[in-house]
Amino acid sequence: MRLAIIGLVLLVAGGITVTTGVLPWQEVAVLVDRVAPILGFVVAMTVVTELVSEAGAFQWIARHLRGWGRGRSILLWLLLALFATLGTVFLSLDTTAVLLTPVVVTVARQAGLPVLPFALTTVWLANTASLLLPISNLTNLLAQHNLGGISPAQFAQLMWAPSVAAVLVPLAFIAIVFRRELRKTYARDSTRPAQGISSKATTDRVLLLVSAVVLLLLLPALVSGVAIWIPAAAAAATLGVAFAVRRPKVLRVTLIPWSLLLFTCGLFLVVEAGQYLGASVLLGEVAGQGDGFLELLRLAMTGALGSNVVNNLPAYLLAEPLAGNPERMAALLVGVNAGPLITPWASLATLLWHDRLVRMNVLVKWRGYALFGLIVAPLTILAAVAALAVFGPGGLFG
């Protein structure tokens, strides 16, 4: 509800800039042409992930992960980190924050292990692992359009090195700080109650099978080069038909992320007006120019600072005109994707993650979160930009 109110305020403010002529209608038309397919994809993928979760796919994986951990905390943690990374890369960071967080917390509780290292792993990877593919993050989709609509394979070729670095640094930090907790063992046959995961979601094997097939077909389609909203919409429609037959009560209008849509549309309008008035020119004085290591690091740090002060989406939109080539665009994405680890509002995924934790009676203090983030975020950005400078276009091994 809070997000919807903010979105409504932004939408009204954006509407005022249009009606008063501050933002010309022609610019609005260009903006709509750019973001409509992206928002269509976001809606479709939200429906897909919600229905897949209702079918019990994530819960099925969670039940097996505890067994695959072989009673060793470190192995279970690595498996859950892989789970969160793959979920972020292929289903987006918000999916990890909203749907995988309860699963990860429940698995840790069932194993009788401390929740904090697992919860932090989830939210950090939801952000830092969102660099590899366009579908991983809304900022990536916008960047893909800005880069001339390059294919997912070309995008991954640009981002693979910083993406690997951005995943490894937070994991290394957690492995060091929580080394005692991760040395523990657990009983593989634990009978602890599965708090936070609905048992009704696993009762329909037909829906579980349909969801698995849809996901197996959807993931390669999303990286095939076809406009991503098309396979996402087809997957949402297929699952919608299956649920209409098997569990029609699940199909409700709340499957569509109305608050997120309202917030995003309003934000796009306001930021577009700011760009039209020259906000990006002022930001350019801070972000600098050039594509050497220090220049790329400066741009990435600017994106991270803007993300933690305001939010990563407006930080990206305002700095986008400053990313004039693939190297600088990659550096900006490192900043706005891997940098929002300090303040609660830096990324929507972090707020969604914390909301899920509160619902499950897991206490994570923002002060401690920020202190950890002040260490992890700069180290992650430094490592990711270094990887970009070495392996990216024009780099030593690029």
Predicted regions and their residues:
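Interfacial loop-to-helix junctions that mark the boundaries of transmembrane helices
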Residues: 1-4, 25-38, 152-162, 202-204, ...
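Hydrophobic mid-bilayer segments of alpha-helices in multi-pass membrane transport proteins
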Residues: 1-23, 34-47, 99, 207-217, ...
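Membrane-embedded alpha-helical segments and adjacent helix-loop junctions characteristic
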Residues: 25, 29-114, 258-260, 264-326
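Alpha-helical transmembrane segments
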Residues: 34-46, 154-172, 327-343
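Membrane-interface alpha-helices at helix entry/exit sites of multi-pass transporters
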Residues: 71-79, 110-122, 150-161, 326-337, ...
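Alpha-helical transmembrane segments and, especially, the helix-loop junctions at the ends
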Residues: 88-98, 115-149, 170-171, 307-317, ...
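Juxtamembrane and boundary regions of transmembrane helices in multi-pass small-molecule transporters
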Residues: 153-199, 345-398
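Long, contiguous bundles of hydrophobic transmembrane helices that form the permeation core
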Residues: 167-247
